[in-house]
Amino acid sequence: MIINNLEEIKDKFFFAIIIGSGPAGISTALGLEEKKIESLIIEAGELNYTSKNTPYLKGTYVGDPDYSTLAGSRGRQFGGTGNLWGGNCNPIQEEEFENWPIKKIDLDKYIGRAKKILNLKNKFVLEKFNNNLDLYNRDWSDVKFGNKYFNHFKKSKYINLSLNTIYQGSDGDNGKITSINCFKKKNYKLKSKYFILSCGGIENSRLLLWTKNNNPKLFKYDLPIGNYYMDHPFHRVAEGLVNYKKLQSYNKKNNVKNAPLITCDSTYNLSCNKDFIKAKKIINSGLYIGFENANKYDSIFKQVRCMAPNFVKKIYEDKTVKDTYKVKVNILQEQEPLFSRKITLNKNSDPLGIPLPEAHWWKTELERKSARVITEEIVKFFLKNDIARIGIEEYLFNRDEYDTQAGYHQLGGTRMGSNTKDSVVDKNLKVHGTSNLFINGSSVFRTGSYNHPTYTIVKLALRLSNHLAKI
């Protein structure tokens, strides 16, 4: 049901009020709906994005210049960034949950429902590629959350949606929220049994920090709100030439069953296994090896000839140009969770007086080292097996500044855990020391992984809805 006027519900007591209508908020409401439990979603934006919302999305980055804006990476509309994302999905692997208060099996029971929400059709695979690297795949979702779910919400008996409704703080003390303050043409107080903050990786920290500043009596502990902020830096690490027929031969000989046919999927996805990560003292990443058609006049042949003349000579002599492809190796990096990388409140405010966020973010030398070690591993493997010759970018071997593209996977800030010193929410996503405040979305990730987050966000949201239905 669409709520156009809050006068209709100002005296109603809901089971759950969900603040934010991105993938996390929508998935939680859908999970509650399955159990015939009523919820209210309040969304600060409209059905579609309008420029008048841009001042609310502004903020600043402190640190590396790669990430110069916050407004372009967030969405204030029904569906949130679920209308902006690229659709890539893959799961966090079992060993990556090592420091989380939950395990992979705790989310596996929600695989079917998450795939339905995201329209995912393919099976996720992870298999050994060589002694140190694993091959994995990504599935692609065509879902734009606003488009897919607005009519569903409009007809629902259990999901209420109020657009243009801005959260302005919480009433209560001693860990219990009694009502939240909202603005929709005028101020309202809305009541519920449970309150779920689902506003995205940066906005969750921003609103929770602001709530704490305005109502410190609500919180029992001095929680690290905003700390351990992470992203997924994406950058080019190498390029060269590969003999695809030899790569196929290696896969067949070594029983690599799920390697993609480049006529269907032009990218190999590789990551490190846990033994290699531990031995090299690095953090993991996803290597994207992209194949492109090549011809003998491409400049890449001249570049590779300089470092591997015999390899190129053999291509011409054996007339295997048709089997030779250009490869560009990109990396999507996990970041170590650091207390000093954080979301704070800026001195500037949005049009309603709520402080804008400030993201303190930078790349570390451990991340450079990790990118170098992982890239060297695949380059050495290709050389040893005479499959390819690939040159590595120089910046991985020195301390020069280097650019990365924004991953726009804003992670951490309200991370989960059992210790109030290094986490904000518990294993059930309840804020430590509170009885009815929960947080949902990528901000609860304890570590960043190298995987795209939305699939895990949806599973966590479904798990939260199941938990709320039981307590």
Task: Annotate each language-model stretch with its function.
Residues 162-173, 324-335, 340, 352-447, ...:
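A glycine-rich dinucleotide-binding beta-alpha-beta segment and adjacent secondary-structure elements
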Residues 58-125, 339-347:
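Redox-cofactor-proximal catalytic regions of oxidoreductases
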Residues 1-16, 34-35, 470:
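Extreme N-terminal leader/targeting segments of oxidoreductases
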Residues 60-61, 222-230, 234-355, 410, ...:
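FAD cofactor-binding and catalytic pocket of flavoenzymes
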Residues 14-41:
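N-terminal Rossmann-like FAD-binding beta1-loop-alpha1 element of flavoenzymes
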Residues 102-179, 401-406:
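Conserved redox-cofactor binding core of oxidoreductases
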Residues 34, 47, 183-254, 441, ...:
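Glycine-rich loop(s) and the adjacent beta-strand/alpha-helix scaffold that form part
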Residues 50-53, 81, 87, 205-211:
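Short, solvent-exposed loop/turn and secondary-structure capping segments
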